[in-house]
């Protein structure tokens, strides 16, 4: 059987993995096998969390919009319902940015949404006759 000489390739592979695992704690940054295992886990977490980040930002935008809406005497779901009824097409990201940076413009959007809602929906819960 022919002898396989791959010392250079093996060292390069190990060096690449150890270089990528530089910030890990303990053996995970020094021993090849531990570093390789940790690198696989790290890449899995990164892949998962890139997708989770989108939902987390949406939650943040909704929280900001809801807080600003309640300051203007309307709830988040009524605000969104009113904006859709009025034909205002602004996404939650931009709506949250407006709520944080430009209160006057957000108040104007709230008034548009309130005007587009049916009258019985404008009444606080429990008082609609």
From Swiss-Prot:
Pfam families: Ribosomal_L20 (PF00453). Signal peptide: none annotated. GO terms for biological process: ribosomal large subunit assembly; translation. GO terms for cellular component: ribonucleoprotein complex; ribosome. Coiled coil: none annotated. Keywords: Ribonucleoprotein, Ribosomal protein, RNA-binding, rRNA-binding. CDD domains: Ribosomal_L20. The keyword Secreted does not apply. Gene3D superfamilies: 6.10.160.10, Ribosomal protein L20 (1.10.1900.20). PROSITE patterns: RIBOSOMAL_L20 (PS00937). GO terms for molecular function: rRNA binding; structural constituent of ribosome. Belongs to the bacterial ribosomal protein bL20 family. Binds directly to 23S ribosomal RNA and is necessary for the in vitro assembly process of the 50S ribosomal subunit. It is not involved in the protein synthesizing functions of that subunit. This is Large ribosomal subunit protein bL20. It comes from Mycobacterium sp. (strain KMS).
């Amino acid at each position: 059987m022919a002898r396989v000489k791959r010392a250079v390739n093996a060292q390069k592979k190990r060096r690449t993995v150890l270089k990528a695992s530089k910030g890990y704690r303990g053996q995970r940054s020094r021993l090849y096998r531990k570093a390789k295992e940790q690198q696989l886990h790290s890449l899995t977490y990164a892949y998962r969390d890139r997708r989770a980040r989108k939902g987390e930002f949406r939650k943040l935008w909704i929280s900001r919009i809801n807080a600003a809406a309640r300051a203007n005497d309307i709830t988040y779901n009524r605000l969104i319902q009113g904006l859709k009824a009025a034909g205002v097409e602004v996404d939650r990201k931009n709506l949250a940015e407006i709520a944080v940076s430009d209160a006057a413009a957000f108040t104007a959007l709230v008034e548009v949404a309130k005007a587009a809602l049916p009258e019985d929906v404008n009444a606080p819960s429990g008082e609609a006759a």
